[in-house]
């Protein structure tokens, strides 16, 4: 499984108690993403990581990487952020989030006007980012869940690194090696060759 711990608990409710105790130690920030289709470019940048005091942490203008013609002439912009439970943004719809983000969009492009927006969608995920606290290493679940043949590889396990595609690939390779070793061990016990 590659799901956040909170989803893993819902999908596999019969996990051993010791394992679920480890899963439950991790707290998450929500990931949010406002996706906009614009009738014109917002900027000439593909990816902006935002460290300023704006209401989002990344602005990815996908159509500065792929041609707008591949998206019906639309300019696709992703605005992502993290939010703690209880953040008012989590209760907003796409139009409300757009209104909240508009001052930040005007920092990127002072000419930006909400009339440029053809459509907007707002997505949120409660398992967006593990919160790394003191003694976090005690909260990292092992890959083997305690249920034969069921393994977990998710962002809680990339510590001390930060989550990212490269680390996800490394986790996948580690778990694949573990599964291969486990399958070989089971086969050996049964007298089979692998």
State where each predicted segment sits.
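Mid-domain catalytic core of redox enzymes
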Residues: 1-91, 95, 103-108, 141, ...
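Short glycine-/acidic-enriched loop or helix-start segments at secondary-structure transitions
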Residues: 9-13, 132, 162-163
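A short coil-to-beta-strand element that immediately follows conserved catalytic motifs
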Residues: 28-31, 109-125
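FAD-binding beta-loop-beta segment adjacent to the flavin cofactor pocket
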Residues: 66-72, 124-159
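Hydrophobic (often cysteine-bearing) scaffold residues that line and stabilize catalytic clefts
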Residues: 94-97, 168
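Alpha-helical packing segments of well-folded alpha/beta enzyme cores
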Residues: 101-104, 175
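Surface-exposed helix-capping loop/turn segments at secondary-structure junctions
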Residues: 107-117, 181-189
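A conserved FAD-binding loop/helix module that cradles the flavin
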Residues: 154-183
